[in-house]
Structures are given as C-alpha cells and as structure tokens.
C-alpha cells in the first residue's frame, strides 16, 4: 500500500536581514522562497542560506507561518 503524504509539508522561507533591518531604504521588499520539508526529520524551524535579491547577497532565510 502507498504511504500517506502528510509528513512532507510546504513552508515559506523569509529573509531575516530584510525583516530585522526594517527593509533598507534602497530595497523594495522582502525576499521569500517556497520549499518543502519533512516534518518527521525536521520538527523545528527550517533555516537555509539563500540569495536575497533585495539585499544583493546570500542571507539566512527562516521558516515563517503561512
């Protein structure tokens, strides 16, 4: 039998430096990525290094609630 797919969920990752800095004067928004994670393997909040087009560098993107 096929296993249920309830362990893998879709999450939003948001740039922490854009949010913390209150969005710089030259930036026009907040970078967000959509990805999936396995709830059983990663029960805590997910944090990944991603490129932020508003900060023009690689920053930590943390999981947020939908």
UniProtKB/Swiss-Prot annotation:
GO terms for biological process: translation. It is found in: Plastid, Chloroplast. Keywords: Chloroplast, Plastid, Ribonucleoprotein, Ribosomal protein. GO terms for cellular component: chloroplast; ribonucleoprotein complex; ribosome. It comes from the Eukaryota. One of its GO terms (molecular function) is structural constituent of ribosome. InterPro entries: Ribosomal_bL33, Ribosomal_bL33_CS, Ribosomal_bL33_sf, Ribosomal_zn-bd. Pfam families: Ribosomal_L33. Belongs to the bacterial ribosomal protein bL33 family. HAMAP family: Ribosomal_bL33. This is Large ribosomal subunit protein bL33c. It comes from Vitis vinifera.
């Amino acid at each position: 039998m096929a296993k249920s797919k309830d362990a893998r969920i879709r999450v939003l990752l948001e740039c922490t430096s854009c949010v913390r800095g209150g969005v710089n004067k030259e930036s026009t928004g907040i970078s967000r990525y959509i990805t999936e994670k396995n709830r059983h393997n990663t029960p805590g909040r997910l944090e990944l290094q991603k490129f932020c087009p508003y900060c023009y560098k690689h920053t930590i993107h943390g999981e947020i609630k939908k």
